Structures are given as C-alpha cells and as structure tokens.
Amino acid sequence: MNISYNWLQEFCEIPYTAQELGEKLTSVGIAVEKVTYIGNYEKVVVGEVLEVENLPGTELFKTKVSTGKEIFEVVTGAKNVFAGFKYPFALPGAKLPNGITIEERRIRGVVSQGMLLSAEELGLLERKGAEPGLMLLPPEAPVGEKIEKVLELDDYLLELDLTPNRGDCLSVLGVAREVAALTGHRLKLAEPELPLDNGSCPVSIEIQNPELCGRYMGIVIKNVKVGPSPLWLEQRLRKAGIRPINNIVDVTNYILLEYGQPLHAFDLDKLASPEIIVRNARAGEKITTLDGVERELTSEMLVIADREKPIAVAGIMGGQNTEVDDDTKTVFIEAAWFNPVSVRKTARKLGLRTDASQRFEKNVDIEGIKRALIKAALMICELAGGTIQGRYGDVYPKKFTPKVIAVSLSRAEEFLGISLDAKRVVEILESLGFRVTIGEKKIFVEVPSYRPDVSLEADIYEEIARYLGYNNFPDTMPIGITTTGFSPEYNFEYKVKNLLTALGMQEIITYSFINPDSYNKLGLSVDEVLTKSVVLLNPLSIEQSVMRTTLLPGLLDIAKRNENRQQENLLLFEMGNVFEKNGEDLPKETKLIGGIALGYRYGDWYNKPRKYDFYYVKGILESLFTSLGINNFSFSAAKDLPFLHPGKAARVYLENTEIGYLGELHPLVQKKYEFKNTPLVFELNYDLLKTLIPAEKKYTPLSPYPEVKRDIALLVEREIPAATFIEVIKGLAINTLKNIEIFDVYEGEKLGPNKKSIAISLTFSSTEKTLSEEEINNFMAQVLKALEAKTGAKLRTF
C-alpha cells in the first residue's frame, strides 16, 4: 500500500523527512519498502491555450499556448483543445514518465514547440469513462506554474509492506497514529457532526445474521449531481493507485484510503423498496457484480439485499442493479462491519478480492464506522450538491466492549530481558491510543477498537518493545537452556533416509499439489481417483489443483525433467505425505516412501554400466528391510496395477501385511511421459513400516560348530512363485535351519510342459553341537515331504 507523505502531515506534525520517516516506521515494525518522490517533472507547466485553428487538410489543430512569460506554437490532435482552457504543457527539452523527450519538430509544415499532455502521458490514471484527450486543469491553476505543484505531485509515497495482523495501518489514519506515537505530537482527528434535523433515516435496516454483520450504518443523500470530482480529490486517489470514477464513488474511495473504512454507494431509486436486509444468500441465488460478471452465490455467503434481490456481496463488491451512474439523484451510503473470516471465505470462493475485502478480512474499526460515514456524507453534499435526508440509520446488535489486559511489569521485564521504567511504559501505551489504569502491582490496559490484534499480555510487551527500540536491547546469551534429544519418530525417519542414501539414492522433495491429468497418465480412472482426492477450491493453477494421493506423479515429473536435461541416470527417493478425503473431517494424511530408478547404474574398472532393472530395485528394498531388522518380508507377483508392467511388478509384504509395491513402469505410461529409458518405481507405506519394526534386537552368539549345507532341485509347476517354497520351509520351524536361498531356476523341454526346476540351498547349524548326518537327513526328509504335500514338488533326479 502507498501512503502520501503530504496526506500524513494533515493528521500529525512530522519533524522528519520522508526518508527519515520511512526508517523510523520500519524500526517500530511498520515496514516501509521504499520511499519515492513522484514530482520528477522537468519543464512541464500549466499552459493556457490562447488560439486554436485547424491545420488545412488534416485533423490536427495549430494552437498558441501561453506560459505567462512566453507564447509557443503547438500542434495537437486532441479533440478537446479549446481557447481559454488550461492544460499540462511540456516545454521543449521536457522528459515524460514514459521516457519520451519533447523536442521542437515540424508537423505538416508547422514547427510544434512543445506538447499538450493527457493524464496518461503524465503517468497518471485517466478517469474511468472519460473521453480520450488532454487533461483539463482547473481555471484557477496559475499559468506557468510547475505541474507538480498544481497536481499535488510534489510529494513522496511510502510503500508499506504490512504484516497480516496490522490491518489498522491500511489507511492514512492508521499510519498517522504510529507517526504521532513516534514524534510525540498530537494526532489531529476531528469528529465530524451532521447538522441537526428532526427526521429519521428513510431506509429501514435489518440484520438477519449478527455473527456475520456486527454493525450496519447507512445514510440517504438526495438531489445529488453525479459528475467529475475536483482535481485535488482525483489526485489523492491517483497517488494511491485508484482510478477516479465520479464524485460519489470517489468520496467512498477517499474515505477508504483515509480511514480504512470501506463504504458503498447505492442508487436508492433502483432498490425495490426503501429497506436494506443483511442476510445469507439463498442457494443458487445469482448477482451480477460491478465488474460485469454474473456470480452464483451459496448459503454461506452474506449479501446486502432489498425485498426482492441481492444488491451487493457483503464486504466485497456491489451489484450492477443498484450502481451509481450519471442519472442517479438519490444515494444510500453504506458503512458496516463484516466478519473477517466470512469475507475471506466468500472472496476466495468467488475468486474476487477487492480493496474493500482486503480491509474487511483484516478487521475494520467497528467504532470508527460512524466517523467515516458522516465525513463521507458531508463531502458528498459539498462536492455533489446533495442534502442529507433525515438522520443516519445504525443497527448495532452487540455493542463493542473494550478488552482490558492486566500487565505485570516484572513479568514484562523478565520477558523482554531489560529493566522498564513504569512512567515510560505508560507514555508509550497512551501514545498508541491505549488507556492505562495503574494498579498496586499491575497496570490495566484498555485496548482500542482499532487494534483487534492486541489480545494477550505478550502483545502489550511487543508494543512496549517496539517503541523502546529493538536496537536498544542489549545482546545477551541464552541462560539455562538445555538441549533435548530428537524424538524417536524423527530418529527413525532420519535412519530410513540415511539407509536409502547409503544405497546410492538421492532425496527429492516435490509439491503436494498435482495436476489431475497425472492420474490419466498413470492409467487410472481420473473420475474415480478424484472422488477420493482433496480438490482445491482456489488453486494457483490447474497444474496444482489436486492434493496428491500417490508420490508417483512428482517422482516421474522430476525424472523426466532431468532426462530432458541429459541427466539420464537417476536413483531418487521421496518421503512425503499423501492426502485422501475423510468425509466431513480433515483429509486423511499418510506418509509414504517412493523411489524411482532410471537409466544405468555406474560401472567400475571391471564392470560396464548396467541398466537398472526389477531385481536391482528389489535388492534396495531387501537391504532396507534387513538394515531395519526386518527379516519376515516377501514379494508376490502383481498384475493388476495399471501403471506397472504386468509381468515385472510385485507387491511388498511385511509379516503378511501389504505395505507397497515395486515394478517396471507400464510401456503405455512410459510412452505418455516420453521416457527414453524404462523407469523402475516403488512406493511403501512409511506409517505402516514404522509399526512393523521389531521392538528390540536380541543378541544371538555365533555357533562354534560347523554349518552344514544341502542343495535340492525340485520339479514344480511353472506358475508357482519361488517365494512359496521358502514360506513352506519356514513354516516347519526347524530351529537349526539358519538360511534358505534359491540359487537357480531352469525351464526346458526335457522337463515337460508347464514345468520348471528350482534349486534351493539350505544351511543348518546348532549352537550346542555338531549336527549328525542322520539329523540332517531327517530335516531334509521333513522339507521334501512338506513341499510335496503343499506344492506338488518332486525331487528332480535328472
């Protein structure tokens, strides 16, 4: 927001330059990003046109322009150039804000000695709806005077970068309060009063939802004449970046800037009845707002309505059906307090943020509404020639009660780490508008209505610290702080990430918001997935409009982006949350670990680089589980995952609980992403993984006795997974069986149709004795018997 230095001086005497003021405000937490002088106009003055004549054969005009000292001959194409009128005039050598330097030049045989200017050429906003042409200056403008003096541009703008809690400083008055506290000078704030009359407000006001509208005031002004505002008012708006419209609307915008109170003007004759109803919109109700857009409302939104229809979206924008135009004769001026949360939600749902909604969202001064409304009414009467009809209407269901905070100075000293002078503390708080009552052990601070951000004792400490000056606080080292260890959850997460990094993977972090088209690329039903997905109401873009239910889209996008940049060999992982709808409650969050392998793994002096494959990624997961102390893991073929190759995919189990999958990306998905090499991916449920980690590791001493290995070759049906044989053998619970390893699988014609040979190595060992041949043979017999009974396996003898 831009604040005029000159305008601030109307509220408070300022002993600082604009630059110094910016630094002072920043030091007390009102950040001033930059201070800009806006009167940089050289050789641009008020010019009076003395004569106008047409240039033969053209649509141009030859004029004589006086600067009081000299007369210049100027050619212009503007249609609104008339003798006796005054306009901004650029002398030869003048440099305009758009970078153009004005020089004498010949136009159609006439030497033009300068240029008459429009508002746009001066870098100013044109009045809305104004005919294009020269900027007309008031008759009283002194001929030859510098244009920055006449247009009040001999001024500085302070560009503020406010924190969200300081909505009170979104106005000249709010900043002036801070300036008064800084300087110690009195704040000049008059309370305008209406002339006495005996009538009441001719418009009835009804608030149906006091929670969303805490106060509503209005006043009727009749016999107004809508037209352009005086130059000084237009210039105040222009300096703040607001385009002038007409004297009625300009006054409401002026009050918005000066007091921070949004107002709205209705054409009273366009209302169906002389009544204002503040109510919730009805489901499906529509309104065309002033920007010409028809908007559908919901029952959560607050509207201003007459007897028949909505006429404004409360706190955001008025409707076209009651817009003030050139034919308006009677206006109703609204000033109100609307619930900040309600305004914010409505603005977000409608995708409509305005200067008014910005202020309502940050809470306006409910006690300052009357001051703003009365001043606006008096200004309209002065500038538009109207008269106030009756009194103002004021519906105020629950009067404001100031919050009183008990403040202990000893606790404040402990909090701030410095000694405080009670008298100075009271001075600071009173200069900021707080009322202070001194008690025996505490002071009691009454918070003004325009500071809703102050609600706790700690907030008062902050106010004190701001004006004591943070630079005056001594540097001290922390005392008595002991370090604490990391939580078990953090330690486990750190361990998993370290293990994956040790296995050659690199961690990435991607956005939680994805493009819904990502599901289509993965071969999933978009409609089906979206029923479970959290869809954003107001996304930054369609590419980030849905919260992810899987980590795959982010992993694949990053891998493809790197491949496009010739980084084709990747081994990446991500640990992050995915989100799923959970009825009316907050979304369900689950933490997953996802990974992707692409291209070739690095070779060495005796091995050439080899492509990442299914077994390499499977080996990463096996190593991870083993390092975490998990031995009871298994894999089973998965043919029903649409984004994975049906013959090169598996589900991952820990203790018979499915926790994820791995596999090669489906060829169709690979084609959609246009990968050159085939990606391998995996995804594990991290939250489940945490619960399946053994509570503690038990020490098992090494056996001093020799191990015995036996190999068997089995003839089995081709479709039986290799893991089945391991599960059957483990199910025998032979306590001396230490290791089971499948070391060969063979298929050939001599085995017979749909048959394969699988070779298994078994390792036996005891910590108590050397196992005898008879014991080993007995164990092997148990194994063969169980395998034959449960899988139909036969001992292969050929």
From Swiss-Prot:
Residues bound to Mg(2+): D453, D459, E462, E463
CDD domains: PheRS_beta_core, tRNA_bind_bactPheRS
Catalytic activity: tRNA(Phe) + L-phenylalanine + ATP = L-phenylalanyl-tRNA(Phe) + AMP + diphosphate + H(+)
GO MF entries: ATP binding; catalytic activity, acting on a protein; magnesium ion binding; phenylalanine-tRNA ligase activity; transferase activity; tRNA binding
Domain FDX-ACB residue range list: 703-796
Domain of life: Bacteria
EC nos: 6.1.1.20
Listed InterPro entries: aa-tRNA-synth_II/BPL/LPL (IPR045864), B3/B4_tRNA-bd (IPR005146), DNA-bd_dom_put_sf (IPR009061), Fdx_antiC-bd (IPR005121), Fdx_antiC-bd_sf (IPR036690), NA-bd_OB-fold (IPR012340), Phe-tRNA-ligase_IIc_bsu (IPR045060), Phe-tRNA-ligase_IIc_bsu_bact (IPR004532)
Localization in the cell: Cytoplasm
Cofactor: Mg(2+)
UniProt cofactor note: Binds 2 magnesium ions per tetramer.
GO biological process: phenylalanyl-tRNA aminoacylation
Keyword tags: Aminoacyl-tRNA synthetase, ATP-binding, Cytoplasm, Ligase, Magnesium, Metal-binding, Nucleotide-binding, Protein biosynthesis, RNA-binding, tRNA-binding
Family stated for the protein in its record: Belongs to the phenylalanyl-tRNA synthetase beta subunit family. Type 1 subfamily.
Protein name: Phenylalanine--tRNA ligase beta subunit
Organism field: Carboxydothermus hydrogenoformans (strain ATCC BAA-161 / DSM 6008 / Z-2901)
High-level lineage: Bacteria, Bacillati, Bacillota, Clostridia, Thermoanaerobacterales
